[in-house]
From Swiss-Prot:
<dbReference type="Pfam" id="PF10607">
    <property type="entry name" value="CTLH"/>
</dbReference>
<keyword id="KW-0862">Zinc</keyword>
<keyword id="KW-0131">Cell cycle</keyword>
<feature type="domain" description="CTLH">
    <location>
        <begin position="159"/>
        <end position="216"/>
    </location>
</feature>
<comment type="function">
    <text>Core component of the CTLH E3 ubiquitin-protein ligase complex that selectively accepts ubiquitin from UBE2H and mediates ubiquitination and subsequent proteasomal degradation of the transcription factor HBP1. MAEA and RMND5A are both required for catalytic activity of the CTLH E3 ubiquitin-protein ligase complex. MAEA is required for normal cell proliferation. The CTLH E3 ubiquitin-protein ligase complex is not required for the degradation of enzymes involved in gluconeogenesis, such as FBP1.</text>
</comment>
<dbReference type="InterPro" id="IPR045098">
    <property type="entry name" value="Fyv10_fam"/>
</dbReference>
<keyword id="KW-0963">Cytoplasm</keyword>
<keyword id="KW-0009">Actin-binding</keyword>
<dbReference type="InterPro" id="IPR006595">
    <property type="entry name" value="CTLH_C"/>
</dbReference>
<keyword id="KW-0833">Ubl conjugation pathway</keyword>
<dbReference type="GO" id="GO:0005886">
    <property type="term" value="C:plasma membrane"/>
</dbReference>
<dbReference type="InterPro" id="IPR013144">
    <property type="entry name" value="CRA_dom"/>
</dbReference>
<protein>
    <recommendedName>
        <fullName>E3 ubiquitin-protein transferase MAEA</fullName>
        <ecNumber>2.3.2.27</ecNumber>
    </recommendedName>
</protein>
<keyword id="KW-0472">Membrane</keyword>
<keyword id="KW-0206">Cytoskeleton</keyword>
<keyword id="KW-0597">Phosphoprotein</keyword>
<dbReference type="GO" id="GO:0008270">
    <property type="term" value="F:zinc ion binding"/>
</dbReference>
Length: 396
């Protein structure tokens, strides 16, 4: 029964942590399916139009040359339709195979073979590291690790590389690449009520003001801001006020609008919308898993100033992770468990806790192992006591 409950808990944990592993390729498949449908419908309508024109021409007494020309047009449109259909189906097939490959990989976690389970855990760790590196901007390192581990089709490298191109273009103060991304994902961004495209248009207006191209800025505003309403209308009104001030003005809020730091805000906004679009969290799975693990074993003993209670085997007590775990909550422990400082073994009825006269507690088996001439030396204070002076501790 306990084994079944443990298996169920593991399965639920995987569903939570591995959600992005399946969600990202599924969204890619869905996007390609909708794009294929639009392409095929468009090309089919073109074929229908030329066929209708051919039928209309044949209803009269057409010349041979005109019929041949129309037939060539039909053949050309059919060729385009076939090519677009083949390309679309191939793209969908690639995405479907990727989804299948990831599902098969996740199924491997329930293998009865210890060696296979160990390999799967290693791959899972590598996947977490690759995603974390991609989020941190270490793209080359992430790609090399994915290639070395053979997990290129199990991580979302393509999505992050696309995001990299957009972010780099924004760092160069260019909006074209990001606007193209917004156009590719227009329907889903609209459902999300994203304001990214509007923010980009506002920034383009600001840059025209910065370059003192005020007439171009007015034309830009008429083209892109005519449908603004609500809070967006307030932003437009504020931006239009810049027309009355020079680019080097020190008057707020126009000085803030002209601040180059707005480009960094656009990068953050794009990153946020990109994660929402693919239903990813703001933190990587590696970060969440590490924080959960540290919190599960964190105790007040890990932060005692004298350092006497720190364990060399405790990750939270280590210098590298101690500071990282500081803002995390303590472990919830309904039942206390005493661990011997000497051996690291649990103190229980088979290894009862024994207290020396100086107040330090050790396991009975550990005191036996260090006893010499019926005397024991406290590892912490170096005080010497008779073994008989150790008293059994009872936990209520």
């Amino acid at each position: 029964m306990a084994v079944q409950e443990s298996a169920v808990q593991l399965s639920m944990t995987l569903k939570v942590q591995e959600y992005p592993t399946l969600k990202v390729p599924y969204e890619t498949l869905n996007k390609r399916f909708r794009a294929a449908q639009k392409n095929i419908d468009r090309e089919t309508s073109h074929v229908t139009m030329v066929v209708a024109e051919l039928e209309k021409t044949l209803s009269g007494c057409p010349a041979v040359d005109s019929v041949v020309s129309l037939l060539d047009g039909v053949v050309e449109k059919l060729s385009v339709l076939k090519r677009k259909a083949v390309e679309s189906i191939q793209a969908e097939d690639e995405s479907a195979k990727l989804c299948k490959r990831r599902i098969e990989h996740l199924k491997e976690h329930s293998s009865d073979q210890p060696a296979a389970a160990s390999v799967w855990k290693r791959k899972r760790m590598d996947r977490m590291m690759v995603e974390h590196l991609l989020r941190c901007g270490y793209y080359n390192t992430a790609v090399k690790l994915a290639r070395q581990s053979g997990i290129e089709d199990l991580v979302n490298i393509e999505m992050f590389l696309t995001a990299k191109e957009v972010e780099e273009s924004l760092e160069r103060r260019e909006t074209a690449t990001c606007l193209a991304w917004c156009h590719d994902n227009k329907s889903r961004l609209r459902k999300m009520k994203s304001c990214l495209e509007f923010s980009l248009r506002i920034q383009e207006f600001i840059e025209l003001i910065r370059q003192n191209k005020r007439l171009d800025a007015v034309r830009h505003a008429r083209k892109h801001f005519s449908q603004a309403e609500g809070s967006q209308l307030d932003e437009v009104r504020q931006a239009m006020g810049m027309l009355a001030f020079p680019p080097d003005t020190h008057i707020s809020p126009y000085k803030d609008l002209l601040d180059p730091a707005r480009w960094r805000m656009l990068i953050q906004q794009f990153r946020y919308d990109n994660y929402r679009l693919h239903q990813l969290g703001n933190n990587s799975v590696f970060t969440l898993t590490l924080q959960a693990g540290l919190s599960a074993i964190k105790t007040p003993q890990c932060y005692k100033e004298d350092g006497s209670s720190k364990s060399p085997d405790c990750p939270v007590c280590s210098r590298s992770l101690n500071k990282l775990a500081q803002p995390l909550p303590m472990a919830h422990c309904a039942n206390s468990r005493l661990v011997c400082k000497i051996s690291g073994d649990v103190m229980n009825e088979n290894n009862p806790p024994m207290m020396l006269p100086n107040g330090y507690v050790y396991g009975y088996n550990s005191l036996l192992s260090i006893r010499q001439d019926d005397k024991v030396v406290c590892p912490r204070t170096k005080e010497v006591f008779h073994f008989s002076q150790a008293e059994k501790v009872y936990i209520m």
